[in-house]
Amino acid sequence: MSLCINPSLIRQYLYCPMAAYYIAAGAPEPPTLRMQRGREIQQEAAQAAAKALGAERAEYSVHITAPPLCGTVDAVLWINGRPSPLEVKAAARPRRIPIHHKAQAAAYIAMVQRAYGRAVATAYIYYAESGQIAQIRMAKDLQELLNYAVSRLQQILQGKPPVLNPNPAKCQNCWYRKWCSHLPTTVEKI
C-alpha cells in the first residue's frame, strides 16, 4: 500500500471511512456511469469554469506530489496572479456544499500551495450539471479536519481498519455494503 494520500480518498473517508479502507486495500468500486461521465466532461467543464472565473491562465490535469498528499488536480487556475485548484464534479451543485467536498478542495489547496510555492487561500468546485461554481476558502476548522482525515488515513494505509459506523441513508446504495454487513458496529468519535 502506498503512503501517498489522494484528495479523493480524503473525500471518501469523510463520507464513509470503511469505503476509504476498501479503496486503500486495493478494492476500488467499479466505475459507475456518473464516474465515466465525469471523466468525459472534465476538460470541457474545467475550461468553462476557467472562463467563468476570469482565469488569466489554466493548467489542466496537473499531477502533484506533496507528501503525504498526492494526486491530479482537475485544473490549476491563475486568478489575480495566484494559483487556485479547481475540482470538477459531474453533479449539480447541492444546496449546501458537503463537508467531504470542502475537505477534498482543502487538500488540493495544500498541494497547490506546496507545489507552486505561493500562498493559496481558495479552491473552486465546478458542478457541471448545473454549471455552478462553489468557492472554498481554507479556514482553521477546515485545516483541522484535513489534518484529522490525513492522520486517520495514514493509520488505514498502515493496516488499521476504521471503526464501522453504519448509516442507512449512505449504506443502502453503497457498493461496499456487502462487505460491511457482517462487521460489528460501534460509533467513532471525531
Curated annotation (Swiss-Prot):
Its cofactor is Mg(2+); Mn(2+); Cu(2+); [4Fe-4S] cluster. Mn(2+) binds at residues 74, 87-88. One of its GO terms (biological process) is DNA catabolic process. The keyword Iron-sulfur applies. The keyword Iron applies. Keywords: 4Fe-4S, Antiviral defense, Exonuclease, Hydrolase, Iron, Iron-sulfur, Manganese, Metal-binding, Nuclease. Its EC number is 3.1.12.1. [4Fe-4S] cluster binds at residues 16, 171, 174, 180. GO terms for molecular function: 4 iron, 4 sulfur cluster binding; manganese ion binding; single-stranded DNA 5'-3' DNA exonuclease activity. Induction: Slightly induced by 20 J/m2 ultraviolet light. Member of the csa1-cas1/2-cas4 operon. The gene is cas4. It catalyses: exonucleolytic cleavage in the 5'- to 3'-direction to yield nucleoside 3'-phosphates. CRISPR (clustered regularly interspaced short palindromic repeat) is an adaptive immune system that provides protection against mobile genetic elements (viruses, transposable elements and conjugative plasmids). CRISPR clusters contain sequences complementary to antecedent mobile elements and target invading nucleic acids. CRISPR clusters are transcribed and processed into CRISPR RNA (crRNA). This may be a 5' to 3' ssDNA exonuclease. PANTHER family: CRISPR-ASSOCIATED EXONUCLEASE CAS4, DNA REPLICATION ATP-DEPENDENT HELICASE_NUCLEASE DNA2. Pfam families: Cas_Cas4 (PF01930). InterPro entries: Cas4_exonuclease, CRISPR-assoc_prot_Cas4, Dna2/Cas4_DUF83, PDDEXK-like_dom_sf. Can form a Cascis complex with Cas1/2 and Csa1. The lineage of its organism: Archaea, Thermoproteota, Thermoprotei, Thermoproteales, Thermoproteaceae. This is CRISPR-associated exonuclease Cas4.
